[in-house]
């Protein structure tokens, strides 16, 4: 399969730079997987699309203020983007500089350059950085870090982004990008879903900066997926198996929930799904046999991204590309702060030929 098979024309004006004033009032494009039929509506329509006993699986990761500015003590400006927190003192990060720092280099971080750190080692494209500070890493990041808005949101971060670029149920700090499908859920909608008898479970996948890396190969089978840490605890496994046993559906909220659940299913030895705690490099593209999920809530993704490939594997390639074409024609808002889709599984996607 060629990466270019997953391209589509997107006017710059459809890229959302700010979220809707009310989270759950965004637009919702529903795609019926088996038929390809499209329905236009509002995100709160989700309430009518789910049945009592269905299980929504959310990702409860919390975005950290992962972008730091500063300079090398020897001179030269740097920009640091945290990939993950290693412990209370160390981070693994991308560093943008005119000349990459060498191990042992002293870094002065923060807008006022008040935080001292040392680049201790290099691991491929990533740098290990240790803070010379009594405070734990997370406290330092909260004090001096900027919210890591995606590169296509072409504006500086604002104070409001510290809450707007978080899901209302975010709990475990560690992501450098929000699981954006979850941004549309507000407390009234969650309460209404519970009232209807919709079950809820929470996985954790700390989204890494690799999620924004372009696919740099021509053939998607040659792509090497970035690694991210995921947790699927026993209570999620129990909820999934119970929902399946009673004939209800598993609805993943976002591609990160998909990747967490499917990673846990891939690693399972004796059951459909078992607890999973570890790094995952799962790459889902057409031809992948989904094991757990029956429906998906997701935003609109970048052309030629691994995420539009994941959606195509679920809904079918032609159905997905047709839906995206319709979304552009109907002026849906795209990407992290944009509108959403509700998609049901297309069993024919597994054997569909990909290509235009």
Swiss-Prot record:
Superkingdom, taxonomy of origin: Bacteria
Protein name: S-adenosylmethionine:tRNA ribosyltransferase-isomerase
Primary role: Transfers and isomerizes the ribose moiety from AdoMet to the 7-aminomethyl group of 7-deazaguanine (preQ1-tRNA) to give epoxyqueuosine (oQ-tRNA).
GO molecular function, one term: S-adenosylmethionine:tRNA ribosyltransferase-isomerase activity
PANTHER family: S-ADENOSYLMETHIONINE:TRNA RIBOSYLTRANSFERASE-ISOMERASE
Catalytic activities: 7-aminomethyl-7-carbaguanosine(34) in tRNA + S-adenosyl-L-methionine = epoxyqueuosine(34) in tRNA + adenine + L-methionine + 2 H(+)
Organism: Citrobacter koseri (strain ATCC BAA-895 / CDC 4225-83 / SGSC4696)
Location of this chain's protein in the cell: Cytoplasm
Lineage, uppermost ranks: Bacteria, Pseudomonadati, Pseudomonadota, Gammaproteobacteria, Enterobacterales
InterPro entries: QueA (IPR003699), QueA_dom1 (IPR042118), QueA_dom2 (IPR042119), QueA_sf (IPR036100)
Pathway assigned in UniProt: tRNA modification; tRNA-queuosine biosynthesis
Family: Belongs to the QueA family.
Enzyme Commission no: 2.4.99.17
């Amino acid at each position: 399969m060629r990466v270019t098979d997953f391209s589509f024309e997107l006017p710059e004006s459809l890229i959302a730079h700010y979220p809707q004033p009310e989270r759950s009032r965004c637009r919702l494009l529903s795609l019926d997987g088996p038929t390809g039929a499209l329905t236009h509506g509002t995100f709160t329509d989700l309430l009518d699309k789910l049945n009592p006993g269905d299980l929504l699986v959310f990702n409860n990761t919390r975005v950290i203020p992962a972008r730091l500015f500063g300079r090398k003590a020897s001179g030269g400006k740097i920009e640091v983007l945290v990939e993950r927190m290693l412990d209370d003192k160390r981070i693994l990060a991308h560093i943008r500089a005119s000349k990459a720092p060498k191990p042992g280099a002293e870094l002065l971080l923060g807008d006022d350059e008040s935080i001292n750190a040392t680049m201790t080692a290099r691991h491929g494209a990533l740098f290990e950085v240790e803070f010379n500070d009594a405070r734990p890493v997370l406290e330092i990041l909260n004090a001096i870090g900027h919210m890591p808005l995606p590169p296509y949101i072409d504006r500086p971060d604002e104070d409001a982004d510290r809450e707007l670029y978080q899901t209302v149920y975010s709990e475990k700090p560690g992501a450098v990008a929000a699981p954006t499908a979850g941004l549309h859920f507000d407390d009234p909608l969650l309460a209404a879903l519970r009232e209807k008898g919709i079950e809820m479970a929470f996985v954790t996948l700390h989204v890494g900066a690799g999620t924004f890396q372009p696919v740099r190969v021509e053939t998607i089978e040659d792509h090497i997926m970035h690694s991210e840490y995921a947790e699927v605890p026993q209570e999620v496994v129990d909820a999934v198996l119970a929902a399946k046993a009673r004939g209800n559906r598993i609805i993943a909220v976002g591609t990160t929930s998909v990747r967490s659940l499917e990673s846990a299913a891939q690693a399972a030895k004796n059951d459909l799904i078992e607890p999973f705690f570890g790094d995952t490099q799962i790459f889902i593209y057409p031809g992948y046999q989904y094991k757990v999920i029956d429906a998906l809530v997701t935003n609109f993704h970048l052309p030629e991204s691994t995420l539009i490939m994941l959606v195509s594997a679920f809904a079918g390639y032609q159905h997905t590309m047709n839906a995206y074409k319709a979304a552009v024609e109907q002026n849906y808002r795209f990407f992290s702060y944009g509108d959403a889709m509700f998609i049901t599984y297309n069993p024919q996607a597994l054997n569909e030929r990909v290509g235009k």
